[in-house]
Curated annotation (Swiss-Prot):
PROSITE patterns for this protein: AA_TRNA_LIGASE_I
Source organism of the structure: Symbiobacterium thermophilum (strain DSM 24528 / JCM 14929 / IAM 14863 / T)
Xref: Pfam families: Anticodon_1 (PF08264), tRNA-synt_1 (PF00133), tRNA-synt_1_2 (PF13603), tRNA-synt_1g (PF09334)
CDD domains: Anticodon_Ia_Leu_BEm (cd07958), LeuRS_core (cd00812)
Top EC class for this record: ligase
Keywords: Aminoacyl-tRNA synthetase, ATP-binding, Cytoplasm, Ligase, Nucleotide-binding, Protein biosynthesis
EC numbers, comma separated: 6.1.1.4
GO MF, one example: leucine-tRNA ligase activity
Membrane listed as a keyword: no
InterPro entries, sorted: aa-tRNA-synth_I_CS, aa-tRNA-synth_Ia, Leu-tRNA-ligase, Leu_tRNA-synth_edit, M/V/L/I-tRNA-synth_anticd-bd, Methionyl/Leucyl_tRNA_Synth, Rossmann-like_a/b/a_fold, tRNAsynth_Ia_anticodon-bd
Protein name according to UniProt: Leucine--tRNA ligase
Catalysed reaction equations from the record: tRNA(Leu) + L-leucine + ATP = L-leucyl-tRNA(Leu) + AMP + diphosphate
Length: 861
């Protein structure tokens, strides 16, 4: 065969232009067809695509292209999550206008995405930094505000001194800023929050709806983040003042073992103690110093299991309401004000953290759960006892198995009026305020007369000024911009001040998938009919790093909007795939390691189709992929081999066309192309004349189409699908060596094989497929064609290989007719010369045939 090569440098841009000009990927609501919404997490416009992007988007594009060919009405959009700190940092460091910087980066990345041949409907692109998008982000904030789901309060927040902004709990990793790695400190600020805790139970409960569609790891991560705990709330009393100090515990069965209480340094009772004159000034000074030290530690640093437990005695005691015993009141680093009640009972005998704290500070240990052997002695303990046991030293509950005692202790507290059963959550309300300028402004004004006033919807958007002064110092540039800050009150018309915080960029990305359904709408964020038709997203693909952040917030938004009557779905993403990373030499790609691979360079050298093929072939999508130069070269070789196979088969294809009547109503037929139906009809008539080689190639082709269809439809086994495509290619080459294209039956068989192969490669290598489809005479794009069909009867093998075992060891392999009975299999196996020689002179105990697979012969002697 001629060494003809696929000229990707000429063909790929040409097909991209044609797809764009013809708008073949544009999509509208169509109630007559099943819909499929395929979505990749949209990128931040950093300016350059990296291989992680390419892998993510290629996975989704293959899914989208396959579903289109299967007859689905496919929504496959793209946009840019374009607010955030990198643009602002560029403005600070280089004097760039963040809007211009963002726009230029988007243009560059859009060109790169088009180079990859992705089948996006670009008319639906969304850009979160544009007014036509953030207007609706602000509108949604106002709806949350009306429902009491957006509120402002002063709270200790995570503060990044480098980024000069507040971070959500989820954005603090090991005590450091997730973006710049600076140590995070605490700061008291008035902040805006979304009341996500109001949906905690539903967010937790509805994870069950995602079983089978979402990775178990992601569901567990969200479950742990929400952190629902059932237990009891019990009120202890500060002996000196009578103040009640509530605690939350999941172990009320141990409450008789309390020997101390620990409160967070920020707890209101600490301030009261320090200002009441109840303790000496030197102790007050020590407490103040301890509080100041804690301000510079993040929650992660304070609560880490590796962190040393630090505490300070307040000098006062609390009274245990169950037994009237006194317990010392301490403050400690490991108790947080925003988890539970900010106060924790100390039971060192039955909680390891409490035990370590008691050991360090010489606090008493009291056993109240005895082990089955009855051998626990407080003075002999080297660790807390946390296993089940019998309640002791517990008043009326002595002798009760502790697990049975939990509800009894709670009931007693409720009867006595000092406690009740309750549920606590690890999840905190979502802090959305950011002291940065490059974000969606919060649509609130402050009036001395009217107080906090929401901006009327008719006045949206609250626009970002074009002339902000980005120095990187002194908080947000918005707060220093008098033209932005000073405004008039919408209620009284008097002077007012705008809110200068912007919204966390995760607010923008919590609803973008809804805007894609109706992105040009200037009257509302989306049309209800469109959003109800397209939602939920059928397949979402993105990194595992978003398991808690983005995915939890998007679920929360969807549930709130459902309750407002704006959407009907309970969950936004029916199925989730978290793709693995792209590695080089076994390590994550990074500039510092010098192991990055540029997508642009790879496209220039090998073509987009070869890059796509390698990425989909090298590893299953959920696993990490190690970039291989040999692998991409192999993919490029296969692209050319496939191209040569089809081009060399064109004479046979044209001969097959000449054998069948032309349909004058079909442009493809007139231009020399064949439809699947025409080929099938021709082969049905030619069936009596097919040779064994003809039938075998047809069997391989139909069986492989069946297998690849299952690989793509059911399990996203892209690598095995490509392996099947390679098997088809090898089978066609082998057939060509044996058969003559001028023979009528051979021409028809080859035409069928080549046509199905080109259709199957289309989702993976879209440019190559369209180029070959065009050369075969088809006037319209292959991406508008249906997925190839397969015939179950044709796919069946005439013969199968069975294994013959003797006492479990393989002794022979035999070709037998497909569909052979168990009795016939036994007879064939026993007739084997190898088997007869091995069983000669031995007693045959039994013969166990497994139809279509094996015969096991059990012998003795």
């Amino acid at each position: 065969m001629a060494e003809e090569r696929f000229d990707f440098r000429e063909a790929e841009p040409r097909w991209q232009r044609r797809w764009d000009e013809e708008g073949i990927y544009k999509v509208e609501r169509d109630l007559s067809r099943p819909k499929y919404y395929a979505l990749a997490m949209f990128p931040y416009p950093s300016g350059k695509l990296h291989m992680g992007h390419v892998r993510n988007y290629t996975i989704v594009d293959v899914i989208a292209r396959y579903r289109r060919m299967k007859g689905y009405n496919v929504l496959h959009p793209m946009g840019f999550d374009s607010f955030g700190m990198p643009a602002e940092n560029a403005a600070i460091q280089h004097g760039a206008n963040p809007a211009v910087w963002t726009r230029e980066n988007i243009a560059e990345m859009t060109a790169q995405l088009k180079q990859m041949g992705y089948s996006y409907d670009w008319s639906r692109a969304v850009y979160t930094y544009r007014e036509d998008y953030y207007r609706w982000t602000q509108w949604l904030f106002l709806q949350f505000y009306k429902k009491g789901l957006a509120y402002k309060k002063t709270a200790p927040v995570n503060w990044c001194p480098s980024c000069q902004t507040v971070l959500a709990n989820e954005q603090v990793e090991d005590g450091r800023c997730w973006r710049c790695d600076s140590v995070v400190t605490k700061k008291d600020l008035a902040q805006w929050f979304f009341r996500i805790t109001q949906y905690a139970d539903e967010l937790l409960e509805d994870l069950k709806l995602l079983e089978g569609g979402w990775p178990e790891q992601v569901r567990i991560m969200q479950q742990n983040w929400i952190g629902r705990s059932e237990g009891a709330r019990v009120e202890f009393t500060l002996e000196a003042t009578g103040d009640k100090i509530p605690i939350f515990t999941t172990r009320p069965d141990t409450i008789y073992g309390v020997t101390f209480m620990v409160v967070a340094p920020e707890h209101p009772i600490v301030e009261k103690i320090c200002t009441s004159g109840l303790i000496p000034e030197e102790r007050v000074a020590a407490i103040r110093a301890f509080q100041e030290k804690m301000k510079h530690l993040s929650e992660i640093a304070r609560t880490s299991t590796e962190a040393e437990k630090e505490g300070l005695y307040t000098g006062l005691d609390v009274i245990n309401p169950f037994n009237g015993e006194k317990a010392q009141l301490w403050i400690a680093n490991y108790v947080l004000m925003d988890y539970g009640t900010g106060a924790v009972m100390g039971v060192p005998a039955h909680d390891q953290r409490d035990f370590e704290f008691a050991q360090k500070y010489g606090l008493p240990v009291k056993v109240v759960i005895q082990n089955p052997e009855g051998t626990l002695r407080a003075e002999e303990m080297t660790a807390a006892y946390v296993e089940p046991g019998i309640m002791v030293n517990s008043g009326p509950f002595d002798g009760t198995p502790n697990l049975e005692g939990i509800p009894k202790v709670i009931a007693y507290a409720e009867e006595q009026g000092f406690g009740q059963k309750t549920v606590s959550y690890r999840l905190r309300d979502w802090l959305i305020s950011r002291q940065r300028a490059w974000g969606a402004p919060i649509p609130i004004v402050y009036c001395d007369k009217c107080g906090t006033v929401p901006v009327p919807e008719k006045d949206l958007p609250v626009r970002l000024p074009d002339d902000l002064d980005f120095t990187g110092e002194g908080g947000s540039p918005l707060a220093r911009h008098e033209g932005f800050v000073n405004t008039t009150c919408p209620q009284c018309g008097g002077p007012a001040r705008r809110e200068t915080d912007t919204m966390d960029t995760f607010v923008c990305s919590s609803w973008y998938f809804l805007r894609y359904t109706d992105p040009q709408n200037a009257e509302r964020p989306w049309n209800r009919e469109d959003v109800d038709y397209w939602m939920p997203v059928d397949q979402y693909v993105g990194g595992i790093e978003h398991a808690v952040l983005h995915l939890l917030y998007a679920r929360f938004f969807t549930k709130v909007l459902r309750d407002m009557g704006l959407v009907k779905v309970d969950e936004p993403f029916a199925r989730l795939l978290t793709q693995g990373m792209v590695l080089k030499d076994g390590s994550k790609m990074s500039k510092s390691k010098g192991n990055t691979v540029s997508p642009e360079e790879m496209i220039a050298k090998y073509g987009a189709d070869a890059v796509r093929l390698f990425i989909m072939f090298a590893a299953p999508p959920e696993r990490d992929l190690d970039w291989s130069d040999a692998g991409i070269e192999g993919a490029a070789r296969f692209v050319n081999r496939f191209y040569r196979m089809v081009v060399s088969a064109l004479p046979a294809y044209q001969h097959a066309r000449s054998l069948l009547p032309i349909n004058p109503a079909d442009p493809a037929s007139v231009m020399g192309a064949l439809s699947e139906a025409e080929i099938a009809e021709g082969l049905a008539k030619a069936a009596p004349n097919l040779t064994a080689e003809d039938r075998e190639l047809r069997r391989v082709i139909h069986a492989t189409v069946k297998r690849i269809t299952a690989d793509l439809h059911d399990r996203f086994a892209f690598n095995t699908a490509i392996s099947g495509l390679m098997e088809m290619t090898n089978a066609i080459y082998a057939y060509r060596e044996k058969q003559h294209a001028e023979q009528n039956t051979s021409a028809l068989v080859l035409a069928e094989a080549v046509q199905k192969a080109v259709l199957i490669i289309a989702p993976f290598c879209p440019h190559l497929a369209d180029e070959l489809w065009s050369r075969m005479g088809h006037p319209r794009s292959i991406h508008l064609e249906p997925w190839p069909a397969y015939d179950e009867e044709v796919a069946k093998a005439d013969t199968v290989e069975i294994v013959v075992q003797i006492n479990g060891r393989v002794r022979d392999r035999l070709e037998v007719p497909a569909g052979i009975s168990a009795a016939e299999m036994e007879a064939v196996a026993m007739a084997s010369e190898k088997v007869q020689a091995l069983v000669a002179g031995k007693q045959i105990v039994k013969v166990v045939p497994v139809p279509g697979k094996l015969v096991n012969i059990v012998v003795k002697g």
